[in-house]
């Protein structure tokens, strides 16, 4: 598993972000594990890497403000989603990863469609 992490910000986004190994725990109660299918690069992502966006996550951080994925595993007490379901990821959750765990109640179920198109439903630059 991989994540696109940055430890600092700078004027050249490609110089501050790197693919690094991701260790992911099993989903906790109320969470699901998601395989990320598509996560676009928008102006808001670039401005976050350069430090020019209005809201900046604490460092180190994982890039990506929007995306879509497929549920791979359910934590205890999850009844609103099922394995194999496509979902819209929470805005700003660090979507430039191969997999992530997210709160099931923050995910939006999606119909089966092109993940690249669905991945761009939430963020405006």
List where the protein language model places each region.
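Extreme N-terminal starter segment of soluble prokaryotic enzymes
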Residues: 1-2
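Short polar catalytic/cofactor-binding loops
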Residues: 7-12, 39-41
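Short gly/ser/thr-rich secondary-structure transition/capping motifs
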Residues: 13-21, 52-53
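Conserved hydrophobic/aromatic beta-strand scaffold that supports enzyme active sites
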Residues: 19, 24, 68-70, 99-101, ...
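Cytochrome P450 core scaffold surrounding the K-helix E-X-X-R motif
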Residues: 44-50
């Amino acid at each position: 598993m991989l994540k696109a992490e940055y430890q600092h910000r700078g004027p050249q986004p490609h110089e501050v972000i790197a693919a690094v190994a991701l260790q992911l725990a099993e989903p906790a109660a109320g969470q699901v594990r998601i395989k990320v299918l598509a996560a676009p690069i928008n102006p808001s992502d670039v401005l976050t890497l350069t430090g020019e966006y209005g809201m900046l996550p604490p460092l180190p951080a994982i890039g990506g403000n929007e995306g879509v994925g497929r549920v791979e595993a359910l934590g205890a007490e999850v009844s609103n989603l099922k394995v194999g379901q496509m979902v819209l990821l929470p805005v700003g959750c660090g979507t430039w990863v191969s997999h992530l765990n997210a709160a099931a109640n923050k995910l939006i179920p999606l119909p089966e469609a092109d993940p690249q198109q669905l991945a761009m439903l939430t963020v405006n630059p």
